[in-house]
Amino acid sequence: MAENFVVVDGGVVAPKGFKANGHKDRKYGAALIYSETDAVAAGVFTTNKVFAHPVALSKDVLVNNSVFRAIVANSGNANCFTKGGMDDAKLLVKKAAELLNIPENQVLSASTGVIGRRMPMDIITTEVERAFENMSSENSNKNASAAIMTTDAFPKTIAVEFEVNGKSVRIGGIAKGAGMIAPNMLHATMLGFITTDIEISKEDLTNSLQKATDESFNNAVVDGDMSTNDTVYVLANAQSGVKYIDCKDKFDSALAYVSKELAKMIVSDGEGAKKLIEATVYGAETKEDAKKASMSIIRSLLLKTAVFGADPNWGRIAAAVGYSGAEMDMSNFDIIISDISLEKQAILVKSGEQIADCGTPELKLAEEIMKEDKIKIIVDLKMGSFENTAFGCDLGYDYVRINSEYTT
């Protein structure tokens, strides 16, 4: 049980009226997500000024259309910064629309992979055809998730369910991402595709997605690089018979949870990563300060390597907060290293005073905690009432190996 909803199986096909499938042959893959009835859609995208052709195409489609039925995505090629890239993006959409027998302007698209290389459209369209062949497969959600992987080590998927007046509402999602993760999506490569059977307006869905994204994907950092292709979509087809207006808080909470869990899976799968890091900053003067400080901790390469080496070098945490731009008083703040369940907590700095030093019980406890797969860093700035949690991972030898071998 998570708050007022439960986790269920099925990912993007858990909500009523959705089908999906994917196929991947070595380097290249494709995934399809399809609503059997008309749906509304919302999307958020990278703010990188160098952006991929499917980002440009789908932004335009979202603005100019109100009915959507499908998402098509390919892996192995980012379709970014290439001559003819927009034609290739449109051809990908056309192929999906033809197979699903729907208008092209009802299809959203996304790509992930190598930047600056022309799309091998004969291979990509063949993968779309293979994905379409078995949209009712028992493994359809898993296939779709696996098809969009590049350097990912595992598929990322989740679904939740909650009840409203005796009726069930479901939200399901898949995502990919392992490197180039430092999204900042408003209106890595990180892709997220979410489905729901709630009845909701485009405006409300957009607002809910933007809030969920800001709490989740925009708080996730693997290596600090912002991709040209970062994209998150939500399709809502109203098949549950439940209206958003009757469960606004429940839906927003559930969508935020799904988004956060997908974000955590992404950073847990950071290229070569072994450990998940959560950094929570309390007591900030503003929400912006809380985010600055927590993201600064997660972005710190020195902190990431310290976590990799299980070294509770809390000075790197203090330094990261200090240069973050957040208001703070170095004579009055706390630093704690904890396990993810908060059962074990090592207080390293209390009210600006050093507690942990060589040989102290606090430092020994911190060393023990740092050996775990998931750790939490807590900072209390004691300046106000705002807080934020950011997600990241350690940085080790394999990150260099993977990225030195992967053509970008």
UniProtKB/Swiss-Prot annotation:
Q: Which UniProt keywords apply?
A: Acyltransferase, Amino-acid biosynthesis, Arginine biosynthesis, Autocatalytic cleavage, Cytoplasm, Transferase
Active site residues according to the UniProt entry: T189 (nucleophile)
CDD domains annotated for this entry?
OAT
Give the protein's recorded name. Answer: Glutamate N-acetyltransferase
Keyword check for Zinc, yes or no: no
Upper taxonomic lineage: Archaea, Methanobacteriati, Methanobacteriota, Methanomada group, Methanococci
The site feature described as Involved in the stabilization of negative charge on the oxyanion by the formation of the oxyanion hole is recorded at T112, G113
Q: Which domain of life is it from?
A: Archaea
- Pinpoint the site Cleavage: A188, T189
Its biological purpose is as follows: Catalyzes the transfer of the acetyl group from N(2)-acetylornithine to glutamate, forming N-acetylglutamate and L-ornithine.
Question: Do you know which SUPFAM superfamilies this protein is assigned to?
Answer: DmpA/ArgJ-like (SSF56266)
- PANTHER family given for it? ARGININE BIOSYNTHESIS BIFUNCTIONAL PROTEIN ARGJ, ARGININE BIOSYNTHESIS BIFUNCTIONAL PROTEIN ARGJ, MITOCHONDRIAL
The principal location of this protein is cytoplasm
Name the gene: argJ
Pathway it belongs to?
Amino-acid biosynthesis; L-arginine biosynthesis; L-ornithine and N-acetyl-L-glutamate from L-glutamate and N(2)-acetyl-L-ornithine (cyclic): step 1/1
What is said about its interaction partners and assembly? Answer: Heterotetramer of two alpha and two beta chains.
What are the recorded Gene Ontology BP terms?
Answer: L-arginine biosynthetic process; ornithine biosynthetic process
Mind listing the GO molecular function terms for this protein? glutamate N-acetyltransferase activity; L-glutamate N-acetyltransferase activity
The family this protein is said to belong to: Belongs to the ArgJ family.
Tell me its EC number(s), please. Answer: 2.3.1.35
